[in-house]
């Protein structure tokens, strides 16, 4: 792999002491691969490191962390207007790794790192909310969002993605739907939503396939609503994902407008955003990402 250009790895600070990762990087450096490593400490670090990556002339910026880290790095990359932006590489090191998992990124660090450096760079979409905040994977609203934001860090560290489900069952007493109206291209729905998923990717919340047919290069966002007229059956529908479930509403559009009479919160790749009005639009071909040739998210 000695002929491959340099890369810069932006590593979430929680993974800075990952010994297998250190060994994998050392092995690649011994093969002649140039890998710069930068560790994030606070919000805004990813943007600064992407700026540095451009000065260094690297061809790939690797996001080492979970969905939040991937979001920060990809958001910084799409801000580049002059010249060709580096490609995005994915190194899943977070609690859930929903986007990387649905994209078919290898779990083995050495294989994921090689793919991030040498894989084919494919143009993929991103999404933007209210002309400001972006997400690469999914926007989730409703009870599921409250669970992912409230699940204790120690529980997530110990149990991974299943921690969200366990914490959700513990919080059944707070289970209430969100009343809202959602419009899109040839789509209109109004009612009580237990869970809302608007996906560029397919899964969120530690492996829940909220938008199982989403693709990252089709110029569309997939919508799935779990209606909340009957709360307990709707919750179990969320977990079982049956194909003929009357509590599930699906849609697809390049944009969605959401209005709620009260404040609701969406989780954008781990970042909460609250309000009563949301305009969510796809950004077609917003960045290049190194993905496996059999990536399920590509059409």
UniProtKB/Swiss-Prot annotation:
The compartments listed are: Cytoplasm
**Pfam families membership:** DAGK_cat, YegS_C
- What are the GO BP annotations of this UniProt entry? phospholipid biosynthetic process
> What cofactor does this one take?
Mg(2+); Ca(2+)
Q: What class of enzyme is it?
A: transferase
What range(s) does the DAGKc domain occupy? 2-133
Say if the entry is tagged with keyword Cytoplasm. Answer: yes
Looking up InterPro entries in the UniProt record yields:
ATP-NAD_kinase_N, Diacylglycerol/lipid_kinase, Diacylglycerol_kinase_cat_dom, Lip_kinase_YegS, Lipid_Phosphate_FormReg, NAD/diacylglycerol_kinase_sf, YegS/DAGK_C
Record-level Gene Ontology MF annotations:
ATP binding; lipid kinase activity; magnesium ion binding
The active site is formed by 271
Q: What is this protein called?
A: Probable lipid kinase YegS
């Amino acid at each position: 792999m000695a002929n491959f250009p340099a890369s810069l790895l932006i590593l979430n600070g929680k993974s800075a002491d990952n010994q297998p990762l250190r060994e994998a990087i050392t092995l690649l450096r011994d093969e002649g691969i140039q890998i710069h490593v930068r560790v994030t400490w606070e919000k805004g670090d990813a943007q600064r490191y992407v700026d540095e990556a451009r000065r260094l002339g690297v061809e790939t910026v690797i996001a080492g962390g979970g969905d939040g880290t991937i979001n920060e790095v990809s958001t910084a990359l799409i801000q580049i207007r002059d010249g060709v932006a580096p490609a995005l590489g994915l190194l899943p090191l977070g609690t859930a790794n929903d986007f990387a998992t649905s994209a078919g990124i290898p779990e083995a660090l050495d294989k994921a790192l090689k793919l991030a450096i040498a894989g084919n760079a494919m143009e993929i979409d991103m999404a933007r909310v209210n002309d400001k905040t972006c997400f690469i994977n999914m926007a989730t609203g409703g009870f599921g969002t409250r669970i992912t934001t409230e699940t204790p860090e120690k529980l997530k560290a110990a149990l991974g993605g299943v921690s969200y489900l366990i914490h959700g069952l513990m919080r059944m007493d707070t289970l209430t739907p969100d009343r809202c109206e959602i419009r899109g291209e040839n789509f209109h729905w109004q009612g009580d939503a237990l869970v809302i998923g608007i996906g560029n990717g397919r899964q969120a919340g530690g492996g829940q396939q909220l938008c199982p047919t989403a693709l990252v290069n089709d110029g569309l966002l997939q919508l799935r609503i779990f209606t909340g007229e009957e709360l307990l059956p709707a919750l179990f529908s969320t977990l079982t994902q049956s194909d003929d479930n009357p509590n599930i509403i699906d849609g697809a559009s390049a944009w969605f407008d959401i209005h709620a009479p009260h404040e609701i919160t969406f989780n954008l790749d781990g970042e909460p955003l609250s309000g009563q009005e949301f305009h969510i639009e796809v950004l077609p071909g917003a960045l290049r990402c190194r993905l496996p040739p059999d990536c399920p998210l590509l059409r």
